[in-house]
Amino acid sequence: ILYEELQNALAGAIRAREGGQDVAANSQMARAKSILAALEAGLDFDRGGTLATTLCGIYRAMQRQLANTPNDVEKLNEVRSGVANLAESWRALVA
């Protein structure tokens, strides 16, 4: 569910940036950053081992990308694509 919400927030930020709606874009970016922080906080390093460490690195890289390039729609799309890949991987694991 958090991956879906993260994808929605990023899509909203992209649409707002493309439409020149800076306030709306900033709001969606803040939401995306908050979701990434929640995903990271939910990692169980004791039980998750290497997977948790890898996901932590991915989440932090995404957070850095959002922080460093908040106005770059191409970079936002890259993060959104990465989230979509993660979501698909989790769906495949539980299927």
Predicted regions and their residues:
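Helix-capping and short linker residues that terminate individual alpha-solenoid repeat units
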Residues: E18, A37, D44, E88-R91
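Short, solvent-exposed, charged loop/turn and helix-capping segments
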Residues: A38-L55
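Long, amphipathic, charge-rich alpha-helical segments that form helical bundles/coiled-coils
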Residues: A52-T69
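Amphipathic, coiled-coil-like alpha-helical segments
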Residues: L76-A95
